[in-house]
């Protein structure tokens, strides 16, 4: 019986051939915590009596949710992670001096490697599957178990094969593809499944698009999202190796067998996609942008950023649309680059000048507004177009506020118009 990529990764880490449904213990290649979830893991670690990390070089803490601290409580919470990192002399501790959103920063640093098993105490840890790794979110106590033992227990997930065909048209990106898939599957249609993205359309998708797609796999209930390594992945890894003096370890590349077993196959013709807008209050409420235009949805705020769409391509797209234009009078716009490197690259390319001159506010890298933390909270009844990943009730502020999830082109064009518009018509 053939195996999927996911089954092969688990087989290698378990030391035996395994298939979906089997329960195995495997060593973890990278454990990821942040300023919100790590203090809970640290408490469990210390209460267990553990004194040392099982594998110090496979543990990272990224300070990204409330950094710089928004209040006394978040400052004290951050202090716990800092003290632990200093005590254990963590190699991979990223604070304000080298900050970024964890799911953008770690790949950028060359710390995510094809063939890895990665866990993180954050649901969007599935992002890293874009590099051919098995990566999933877990609870803080599960993270503590990994810190103490160096491994964890898993049920090998079944895989849904997502076949993407055709070549996407103007202003159609990975964000639109994943929103369309979530519309098809629903928010629990891939529960505890791996979403394996395949098909000829993949070769036309940049790494930033792939990260967006795998990032939102969890919004369909998936355990992970994964894309096989190809020439685009390899070029990205070479670039990361050159920028960081090498990768953390050697890639171990896997491909699904032709006779691998899939629990479901979903085919999406990306050539016929319009930009997809996810209406409140679920990411599965996807509608074509033409419907949103017809609904004449005036907006109060636009937010471009997050671990989903705060990368350099997103800022390039927004700047191209907004050059020489202004944000609508009654609309606010916030731009949050996902890492300091992305921010500096955008400055170097002149993108920040364009966005600021258009009336956008540019913030430091942070999860901030996406989770309703700070730096862009919505008030009662306010409506926001966001390139983020969730639009639940109260996600970005007031319970009566509304979030419409979209790609960066839709967001930028809508900021200019003051209502949701089709960027292809700008």
Curated annotation (Swiss-Prot):
Pathway: Amino-acid biosynthesis; L-leucine biosynthesis; L-leucine from 3-methyl-2-oxobutanoate: step 2/4. CDD domains: IPMI. Binds 1 [4Fe-4S] cluster per subunit. The keyword Cytoplasm does not apply. It is an enzyme of class 4 (lyase). Gene3D superfamilies: Aconitase, domain 3. [4Fe-4S] cluster binds at residues 307, 367, 370. GO terms for biological process: L-leucine biosynthetic process. Keywords: 4Fe-4S, Amino-acid biosynthesis, Branched-chain amino acid biosynthesis, Iron, Iron-sulfur, Leucine biosynthesis, Lyase, Metal-binding. Its cofactor is [4Fe-4S] cluster. One of its GO terms (molecular function) is 4 iron, 4 sulfur cluster binding. SUPFAM superfamilies: Aconitase iron-sulfur domain. It catalyses: (2R,3S)-3-isopropylmalate = (2S)-2-isopropylmalate. It comes from the Bacteria. The keyword Zinc does not apply. InterPro entries: Acnase/IPM_dHydase_lsu_aba_1/3 (IPR015931), Acoase/IPM_deHydtase_lsu_aba (IPR001030), Aconitase_4Fe-4S_BS (IPR018136), Aconitase_4Fe-4S_dom (IPR036008), HAcnase/IPMdehydase_lsu_prok (IPR011826), Homoacnase/IPMdehydase_lsu (IPR006251), IPM_dehydratase_rel_enz (IPR050067), IPMI_cat (IPR033941). It holds the Pfam family Aconitase. Its EC number is 4.2.1.33. Heterodimer of LeuC and LeuD. Catalyzes the isomerization between 2-isopropylmalate and 3-isopropylmalate, via the formation of 2-isopropylmaleate. Belongs to the aconitase/IPM isomerase family. LeuC type 2 subfamily. This is 3-isopropylmalate dehydratase large subunit.
């Amino acid at each position: 019986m053939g195996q999927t990529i996911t089954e092969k990764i688990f087989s290698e880490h378990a030391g035996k051939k395994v298939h979906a449904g089997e329960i195995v213990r495997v060593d973890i290649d990278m454990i990821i915590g942040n300023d919100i979830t790590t203090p809970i893991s640290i408490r469990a670690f210390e209460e267990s009596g553990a004194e040392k990390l099982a594998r110090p070089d496979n543990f990272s803490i990224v300070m990204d949710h409330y950094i710089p601290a928004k209040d006394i409580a978040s400052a004290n919470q951050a202090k716990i992670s800092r003290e632990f990192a200093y005590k254990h002399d963590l190699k991979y501790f990223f604070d304000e001096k080298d900050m970024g959103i964890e799911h953008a920063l770690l790949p950028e640093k060359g710390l995510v490697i094809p063939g890895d098993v990665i866990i993180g105490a954050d649901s969007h840890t599935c992002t890293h599957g874009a590099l051919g790794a098995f990566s999933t979110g877990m609870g803080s106590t599960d993270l503590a178990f990994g810190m103490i033992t160096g491994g964890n227990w898993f049920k090998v997930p079944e895989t849904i094969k997502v076949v993407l065909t055709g070549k996407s048209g103007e202003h159609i990106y990975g964000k639109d593809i994943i929103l369309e898939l979530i519309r098809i599957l629903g928010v629990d249609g891939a529960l505890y499944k791996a979403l394996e993205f395949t098909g000829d359309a993949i070769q036309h998708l940049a790494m930033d698009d792939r990260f967006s797609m795998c990032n939102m796999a969890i919004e369909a209930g998936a355990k992970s999202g994964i894309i096989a390594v190809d020439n685009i992945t390899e070029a990205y890894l070479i670039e990361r190796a050159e920028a960081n003096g090498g990768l953390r370890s050697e890639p171990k590349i896997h491909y699904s067998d032709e006779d691998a077993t899939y629990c479901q196959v979903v085919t999406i013709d990306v050539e016929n996609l319009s930009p997809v807008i996810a209406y409140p209050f679920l990411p599965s409420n996807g509608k074509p942008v033409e419907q949103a235009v017809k609904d004449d949805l005036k907006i109060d705020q636009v937010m471009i950023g997050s671990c989903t769409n705060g990368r350099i391509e997103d800022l390039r797209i927004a700047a191209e649309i907004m050059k020489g234009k202004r944000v609508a009078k009654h609309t606010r716009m916030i731009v949050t680059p996902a890492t300091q490197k992305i921010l500096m690259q955008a400055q170097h390319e002149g993108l920040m000048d364009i966005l600021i001159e258009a009336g956008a506010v540019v913030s430091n890298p942070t999860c901030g507004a996406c989770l309703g933390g700070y730096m862009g909270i919505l008030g009662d009844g306010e409506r926001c177009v966001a390139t983020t990943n969730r639009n639940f009730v109260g996600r970005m502020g007031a319970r009566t506020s509304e979030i419409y999830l979209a790609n960066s082109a839709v967001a930028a064009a809508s900021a200019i118009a003051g209502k949701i518009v089709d960027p292809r018509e700008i």
